[in-house]
Amino acid sequence: MPPSGLELMNGQVLPAFLLCSALLVIKMYVVAVITGQVRLRKKAFANPEDAQRHGGLQYCRNDPDVERCLRAHRNDMETIYPFLFLGFVYSFLGPNPFVARMHFLVFFLGRMVHTVAYLGKLRAPTRSLAYTLAQLPCASMALQIVWEAARHL
């Protein structure tokens, strides 16, 4: 039987999930700040009022480096948000603490490598391998959640 919510708070699973989650959200903020800095450095603004403030409407334009940052951030949203849900629910299933921590750590490290590979323009297939590696624990957690939910129908 899974431990009670009180035991989970004192256990090792939920705190590990919360740590990884908070670090991933901070990483997303860092990518957003980097995007803003690249916009300023490249003078490539999405909105006319921003371009006007920084030199004129000619700077309301796209830039490949800004677009790369935006894609990295969008990819974070496509993967980290589901992880936040899956990891939270998974934490309450009473998983083995070591296995759960490995799920969270593999996802966290995969996303860190993915971001470095994306923003650093590292050679393929670094980014896609990091992406795939990070998706494995999510798939595992999702299947375990589905299994537990179906078992209790």
Curated annotation (Swiss-Prot):
Cystine bridges: none
Compartments reported by the entry: Membrane; Cytoplasm, Perinuclear region
Cytoplasmic compartment spans: 43-61, 121-124
Primary localisation category: membrane
Domain of life, per lineage: Eukaryota
SUPFAM superfamilies listed in its UniProt record: MAPEG domain-like
Entry keyword Transmembrane: yes
GO biological process, one term: prostaglandin biosynthetic process
Pathway terms, separated by semicolons: Lipid metabolism; prostaglandin biosynthesis
Annotated residues for binding of glutathione: 39, 74-78, 114, 118, 127-131
Keyword 4Fe-4S belongs to the record: no
Keywords noted in UniProt: Cytoplasm, Fatty acid biosynthesis, Fatty acid metabolism, Isomerase, Lipid biosynthesis, Lipid metabolism, Membrane, Oxidoreductase, Prostaglandin biosynthesis, Prostaglandin metabolism, Transferase, Transmembrane, Transmembrane helix
Catalytic activity: prostaglandin H2 = prostaglandin E2; 2-glyceryl-prostaglandin H2 = 2-glyceryl-prostaglandin E2; prostaglandin G2 = (15S)-15-hydroperoxy-prostaglandin E2; 1-chloro-2,4-dinitrobenzene + glutathione = 2,4-dinitrophenyl-S-glutathione + chloride + H(+)
Chain ranges on the Lumenal side, renumbered to this chain: 1-13, 92-96
Transmembrane segments: 14-42, 62-91, 97-120, 125-153
Cofactor section: glutathione
GO cellular component: membrane; perinuclear region of cytoplasm
Residues of the site described as Essential for protaglandin-E synthase activity: 50, 127
GO molecular function per UniProt: glutathione binding; glutathione peroxidase activity; glutathione transferase activity; prostaglandin-E synthase activity
This enzyme's EC code(s): 5.3.99.3, 1.11.1.-, 2.5.1.18
Bilayer disposition of the protein: Multi-pass membrane protein
Function statement: Terminal enzyme of the cyclooxygenase (COX)-2-mediated prostaglandin E2 (PGE2) biosynthetic pathway. Catalyzes the glutathione-dependent oxidoreduction of prostaglandin endoperoxide H2 (PGH2) to prostaglandin E2 (PGE2) in response to inflammatory stimuli. Plays a key role in inflammation response, fever and pain. Also catalyzes the oxidoreduction of endocannabinoids into prostaglandin glycerol esters and PGG2 into 15-hydroperoxy-PGE2.
Record family assignment: Belongs to the MAPEG family.
Quaternary context: Homotrimer.
Name of this protein: Prostaglandin E synthase
Species for this entry: Bos taurus (Bovine)
